[in-house]
Amino acid sequence: MICRRPRGIVKVLTFLAITAALPASGQAPIETLHVPELDAGFHLLYELKPGEARKQFEIWHESNPEDPLGSASVAASYLFEECIQQGVLTSKFFLDNKLFLGKIPLHPDPTLRAAFFAADKQAQDLAQQRLRTHPGDANALFAMTLSLGMEADYASLIDKHQLDSLKMVREADKYAQRLLVAAPDAADAYLGLGVANYIIGSLPGIKKFFLGFAGIHGDKRVGLQQLAIAAAGGHYLRPFAKILLALAALREKKPELARTQLKELVAEFPENTLFASELAKLNVPAAK
């Protein structure tokens, strides 16, 4: 989306309202988006067990070689692992403008990087094959939205290539809009869009001016709302959205919102030391 007016957050909330009314309208959620084997893999991922998570994803992909969700899930595991290794998902990173918004790229693991882009490309290739014959296929649209959104996140968070990130988010948004027609409950679609909107909206004025001159806009408010949508109604990416929302909330001086997200994450994933550590940091001032 990268904050296009007037089609922005109003349209997103309209789709969520449609989702809430699904039983009355007779439309059912797209169940194929919710695969138990992938659920198990993502749970392992959020317990900081990326290797075990990938085994789950790869087993499912071997049984469903033409479905792009398997490859997209594998790519997500590499991105999450890279973010953990680089310290991206910490308050130290988010609250330091030099780290969060600076031009200096991080130093990703070459093996993880190559594996991420390979899995991400495979997901897009498989998705495009499906869309050529089934343009409304929910899994394919979700895989395209997710894979492009992850590329955008990698570009902005790891490589610090904001313009490249924006180009990919614009493309991801096209698939997100189509996805929400096919599957109005697919709130995961807003994770990548929310991250990019928030980061671009947080840039210093001069940088935003030049991007705006080129017709590219970011909006922190819209980004936070999109992250909140994914955190509340997402499926596979809900915990990812919750930690990002918590960290963004800390930047915006909204500690209670951050605390709520972190408490819920710690309760759901007790083996995740990162979530527990961030909650402990937040609780130190409150305990004094």
Residues covered by each model-derived region:
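Compositionally biased, proline/threonine/alanine/serine-rich low-complexity intrinsically disordered stretches
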Residues: 26-30, 286-288
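N-terminal secretory signal peptides that target proteins for export/translocation
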Residues: 1-8
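Bacterial N-terminal signal peptides
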Residues: 11-23
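A cross-kingdom marker for long, charged
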Residues: 240, 247-288
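N-terminal carbohydrate-binding/catalytic regions of secreted carbohydrate-active enzymes
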Residues: 73
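Short coil/linker segments at helix-helix boundaries
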Residues: 28-37, 44-56, 66, 77-136, ...
